[in-house]
Amino acid sequence: MPRPHRLRAPFRALVATACTAVLGAGLLAGAGTATADQNAAPKAAEAQAGSRVVGYFTEWGVYGRNYHVKNVETSGSANKLTHINYAFGNVQGGKCTMGDAYAATDKAYSADQSVDGVADTWDQPLRGNFNQLRKLKKKHPNLKVLWSFGGWTWSGGFTEAAKNPQAFAQSCYDLVENSKWADVFDGIDIDWEYPNACGLSCDTSGRAAYKNLMSAVRAKFGSNNLVTAAIPADASSGGKIDAADYAGAAQYVDWYNPMTYDFFGAWDAKGPTAPHSPLSSYTGIPKAEYHSQATIAKLKGLGIPSDKLLLGIGFYGRGWTGVTQKAPGGTATGPAQGTYEQGIDDYKVLKTKCPANGTVGGTAYAHCGTNWWSYDTPATIAGKMNYKNQQGLGGTFFWELSGDTTNGELIKAIN
C-alpha cells in the first residue's frame, strides 16, 4: 500500500499549473485572522505548550516495513510520545471510513509480537493495531491516540464531505467512537491535502469550506475530545496556506501540524538539489518561502497562536542521483534509489548508507558517490528544538515512527 501522507510532493509540479488555473487569484480574498466563537477548542490540559510530541503511526507499516505497535514500545519511543496519530482512515462518499480493516482490527498477534507478551485469540472481539494500541496505552496511561483521516492518497473525498460538514462530522464521530474501540482513541486528526487547492486531486470547495468543516467536527466531538489537523506549509503568496481559512478554523482545533517537510525533492528530477525540510532560508534556496521559519511566521502572522502550532520533522530523507556537486544546488539525472521507492528513504537506512557530511538551512545533507540526500539528524533536530522553544510553539510532530532507528535516535533528540 502507498504511504499517502508523505508522498504528496512528487505530484506537486504536475498539478501546480492546473491548480493556479482552477483556483485563480481568489485565494487571497478575505484573508482572515484567527477569531473565536462558541464552538472553539478548549485549552488543552494534557500537555503544556512546547511539550507535545506527536508521532504518526502508519497502518500499512505492519506489512513490508514490519513495524508494529510493539516497536513503539521497544524503541523507547512510547516514553517520549505524548500523542500518536494513527494514519489513515479514508474519506469516501462524504464520510469517514475504515482504511485497512484487517490491519486495524483483525490481524492476529502472537505473544512475541504483542505489546504485553500475550497472544491474540481467535474469538476475541478486537485484534490488530487497535488492540495493540489499547495495550500500549495501558502501559502508558498518559499517552493519547488520535485517528487521522485523509492523507495524500485519500483526501479526494473531502470535497464531497465539505458539501455537508455536519453529516461528515457525524460519520467520523460514529466511527472513532465505535464501542469496540472507543477507549483507544482520544480524538481525531484531519489531514486534508488540500482544501481549495491541489494535491493528488484539486479541490474547489471555496476558501470557507475548511473552516466550516472543522467547525462541524469540533461541534460533534465536543470539548472532551482532541481535534487536530495537518495543514500545508506553503507560505508563498497565493500558495496553499492562502487557499483556505486556516486562521478562522484555528479556534476549532487543539493544535495544527504544519507539514514543514517535502519542500523539495526528486519530483524535480534534474534538480537543483535542495534539502526537503530546511528550518531556515539559505543562499540559493530554490523557492524563497519554502522553509519552516517562513511557514511558522506566516501562520503566526494570520493570528494563529504559537501554542497551537507544532513544528514538523521528517524521519526520512529525499535524494537524487547523478549528482557531482556536494553543496546544494547541483544538477541531477533523477531520483536516488530508496529501499521502498525512488527518491526517498528512512533515516535509519540513510545514516549508514549515506552519512551526513554537510549542513544547510538548519538541516543535514549527504553526498556519497553520485547520490545526494537531505535529512534531519539528532544534531539538526536539536537546533530545530531551539527554534521551537524560542517561538513558543506547542510542540513537535513527525512523520513517521518507522523511519527512526530501533533505539529511537531521532525521537530522543526531541525535547
Annotate the PLM regions.
Residues A45-N178:
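Glycan-recognition patch characteristic of GH18 chitinases/ENGases
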Residues I84, W147, I190, V217, ...:
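Conserved, mostly hydrophobic/aromatic
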Residues G61-A78, A161-W181, A235-G248, S292, ...:
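Short, acidic/polar
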Residues C172-T204, D262:
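Active-site groove signature of glycoside hydrolases
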Residues M1-Q38:
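Secretory targeting and sorting signals
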Residues K95, G99-G117, P195-D345:
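Substrate-binding surface in catalytic domains of secreted glycosidases
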Residues V62, K348-N415:
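Extracellular low-complexity, Gly/Ser/Thr-rich intrinsically disordered linkers
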Residues T35-A49:
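Low-complexity, acidic Ser/Thr/Pro-rich repeat tracts that form intrinsically disordered stalk/linker regions
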